């Protein structure tokens, strides 16, 4: 729940660059992601699609991802701590529209704070959307009190300012978005060493990095904030949940039962019917018998309309996949869909493109983070070397997610046959080995490599 923006703006004497539509959208995405959408009630259940979509994209983006800072052991240690939890936080970014990596000095070292989009408020930004001033929120619950820390960053004319404020309020009042009363930072042990104000001269960029989901913001096209990966599918997800609930109702409503007269069963000493143990759900008893005074026994087993209902749900899921940039079959069943080779390829390419765009945005954010880490380390006189991002930082993504490997290998094989590519490069790519190992795998000249170097290879 985002705190009252007006209270924060008044307290810090600033203007928050977020309108009500954007604030409401972020709150909606957060509620959908936590399986608590506003349409949830006794009759409408949720499939958990927002979480599944964010999780799958985060998995595809970060699978087998490796990155390191080669010339700074101290910074790299902190950086690897972030890399180890990057998939989880990429999922949060996908769900909520973005996250902030915010390095800070603590106990003689550089640490990284990760701020999700519902705890982050932009204040000012450049014409290209780079955020230069922002408010970060952190909350702590202590017994019946809620403590909120506001951290304000401003980058202006190569001067950088960081201010910290702390507030407390009673946590027993539901839906209270107020800040409460201002208190000292040492009210919370984790905050007692924080400085109330820091001023840095000759700063080159903000001391935080914003990982923004690379999609157009249809909520507020002027906002620097990113949107959820399922922002274009909120209505479809609602309809899918309703259709899913109809299926659950259909299964429950057509559940096998036996309508019987109470006279079928004997009673215990307290007058309760003695229904066979474990069969209470099967028998539905009624206090009647037919006109001929016979004990009624009527099985209830109506036909189920599951095929039509599931087909309807599947259509919603395919539309959601399209809007979220996922390949068909990620959420939906594809057996009942006749697709041409061109349509299947286009579907996969859509997913590849989505993942690649998010990877690029994440890599750019990590580069900015590393620069900020080095700048803060120098400010606090921590001995670190200058970092050349292109030379000293490596990013290794799993290309098999982005590239159609079979097509790529076939193209390489054709190049080898045409004599414009060395065979060991093809083998290295196909089997994931070095060029030296690939050369050892190849038959010796004069044995089987008489004409085509690929004649002996199995396809």
Language-model segments: residues:
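Extended, helix-rich architectural segments
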Residues: 1-132, 139-143, 334, 458-459
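Extended, non-catalytic structural segments that build the interaction scaffolds
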Residues: 23-42, 288-323, 339-362, 392-426
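Short coil/turn segments at secondary-structure boundaries
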Residues: 89, 103-105, 251-260, 330-335, ...
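Extended, regular secondary-structure scaffolds
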Residues: 100-227
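Extended, charged amphipathic alpha-helical segments
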Residues: 189-346, 382
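Active/binding-pocket-proximal capping segment
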Residues: 320, 334-341, 372-376, 382-393, ...
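Long, compositionally biased
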Residues: 351-367, 446-459
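Activation/maturation switch segments at domain boundaries
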Residues: 412-459
């Amino acid at each position: 729940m985002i705190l009252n923006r007006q209270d924060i703006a008044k307290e810090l004497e600033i203007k928050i660059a977020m309108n009500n539509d954007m604030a409401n959208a972020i709150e909606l995405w957060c509620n959908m992601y936590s399986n608590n959408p506003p349409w949830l009630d006794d009759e409408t259940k949720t499939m958990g699609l927002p979480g599944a979509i964010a999780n799958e994209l985060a998995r595809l983006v970060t699978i087998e991802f490796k990155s390191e800072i080669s010339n700074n052991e101290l910074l790299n240690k902190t950086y690897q701590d972030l890399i180890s939890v990057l998939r989880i936080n990429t999922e949060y970014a996908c769900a909520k529209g973005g996250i902030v990596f915010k390095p800070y000095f603590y106990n003689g070292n550089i640490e990284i704070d990760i701020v999700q989009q519902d705890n982050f408020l932009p204040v000012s930004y450049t014409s290209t959307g780079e955020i230069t001033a922002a408010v970060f929120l952190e909350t702590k619950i202590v017994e019946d009190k809620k403590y909120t820390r506001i951290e304000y960053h401003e980058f202006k004319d190569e001067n950088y300012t960081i201010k910290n404020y702390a507030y407390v309020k009673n946590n027993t009042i539901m839906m209270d978005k107020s800040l409460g009363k201002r208190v000292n930072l040492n009210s919370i042990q984790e905050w007692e060493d924080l400085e109330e104000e820091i001023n840095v001269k000759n700063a080159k960029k903000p001391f935080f990095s914003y990982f923004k989901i690379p999609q157009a913001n249809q909520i507020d096209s002027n906002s620097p904030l990113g949107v959820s990966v399922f922002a274009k599918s909120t209505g479809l997800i609602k309809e899918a949940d309703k259709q899913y609930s109809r299926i659950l109702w259909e299964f429950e409503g057509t559940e096998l039962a036996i309508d019987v007269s109470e006279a079928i069963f004997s009673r215990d000493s307290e007058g309760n019917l003695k229904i066979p143990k474990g069969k209470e759900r099967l028998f539905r008893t009624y206090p009647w018998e037919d006109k001929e005074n016979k004990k009624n026994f009527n099985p209830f087993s109506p036909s189920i309309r599951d095929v039509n209902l599931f087909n309807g749900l599947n259509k919603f899921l395919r539309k959601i996949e399209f809007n979220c940039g996922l390949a068909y079959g990620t959420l939906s069943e594809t057996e009942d869909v006749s697709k041409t080779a061109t349509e299947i390829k286009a579907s996969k390419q859509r997913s590849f493109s989505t993942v690649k765009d998010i990877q690029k945005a994440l890599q750019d954010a990590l580069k900015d983070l590393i620069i900020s880490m080095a700048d803060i380390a120098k400010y606090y006189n921590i001995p670190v070397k200058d970092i050349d991002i292109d030379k000293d930082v490596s990013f290794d993504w799993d290309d098999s997610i982005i590239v159609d490997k079979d097509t790529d290998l076939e193209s390489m094989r054709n190049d080898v046959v045409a004599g414009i590519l060395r065979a060991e490069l093809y083998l290295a790519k196909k089997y994931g080995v070095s060029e030296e190992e690939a050369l050892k795998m190849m038959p010796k000249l004069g044995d089987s490599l008489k004409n085509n170097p690929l004649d002996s290879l199995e396809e």
